[in-house]
Amino acid sequence: MYMKLFLHLKSSSGIGLLLVIMLFLPQCRSINIPESTNSANLKVGKYDSPTHFAGIYANAKMKYAFNGSSLRDFEKWQKAFRPELKKLLGLNILEAQFAAYKPKAEMLSSEDIDFAIREHWLIWTEPTVPLPFILLRPKNADQPRGLVIAPHGHSKNTELYAGIYNSEEERASGEEGERDVAIQAVKEGYFAIAPTTRGFGETRTQEDIKKDATSSCRTLLMHDILVGRTPIGDRVWDISKLIDWAFANLPVDQQKVVVTGNSGGGTVTLFAAACDTRISVAVPSSYFCTFTGSIGSIHHCECNYVPGIMQLGEMADVAGLIAPRPFCAVHGKLDKIFPIEESRKAFDHLKQIYTAAGVPDNCELYEGAEGHRYYKDGVWPFVKKHLSQNKE
């Protein structure tokens, strides 16, 4: 076919067009399309979404996918990547708009729960965002001690992590799944903050509150992206403002700041630690995976998505921004929405980053025996081991 076209153009005045075609054809051949996982559909002309997006993912630029090996490679990569990630999340917009803003907070109630004092608070992380949080104070906490911030995932009960249940069934389920994360933290001797994750609870839209919807994540995403912000960026901002407040108002050992949460709380944990270097230890549960093998191929809430994230890198690259600080991914072997095989793949890449940073032992993957839940046995020994290495 190409020879006939060549002879036709050669015999006419289309030599310029011929040159264009000759230049263009090699580019067509260079497009990387992976072998189809469903070639039968392609043969009969059917659209196959996994095949289509596998090709798109394979051709994503991933400008900051780590491929170095030395400490110098690592430091140069991290210095360039972090500001680009923060920009993509919309944090640069928040930082510019609220550069001089100091969040205010108000305590609403306080109660003695035997082993701790439990306080309900509001903090205005933005002038128009009163964010509820629960503070658990260890009794006789006069000396500086560590702080644990525990963002929750997708749940109607935003106070579950603080040991507040709406029914006995919820209590049984919460305790079985070890979801009383802030209670665990205060029993370990830390100040514990259990914040409402933005888009849930009192931070839902009024319409969603009336409908008793679990969240307003979709509305939050759609409205955020109009101005270059994202729900993940908003939630990272909230964590940073809580750290600001805690440093100013509690006797916190500022070298011992931990963030840990399950599922959507794991998302917040990973991105917050990647962006805010004041976080000493990060332990996301039921989240760390590959983007392609989880939110890129399995149905998830809209709040998980950051437009263009894979033009920068994969999830392991984002987690690599936490290095050299300790990071432990806690994950269930039977998790169906963040498959463990993809988590292991991501961890192999993350281990390369931590090795280049000179601290291969500062990252771990703890595998629980069950599915999508919190595994406290993978959290607190890791936290204790690494915080004990931080001097007072």
Residue map of PLM features:
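Acidic catalytic loop of the alpha/beta-hydrolase fold
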Residues: 334-338, 372-373
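Short beta-strand/loop motif that positions the catalytic acidic residue
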Residues: 322, 329-331
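Gly/Ala-rich beta-loop-alpha elbow adjacent to hydrolase catalytic centers
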Residues: 261-265, 269
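N-terminal cap/lid segment of alpha/beta-hydrolase-fold proteins
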Residues: 93-142
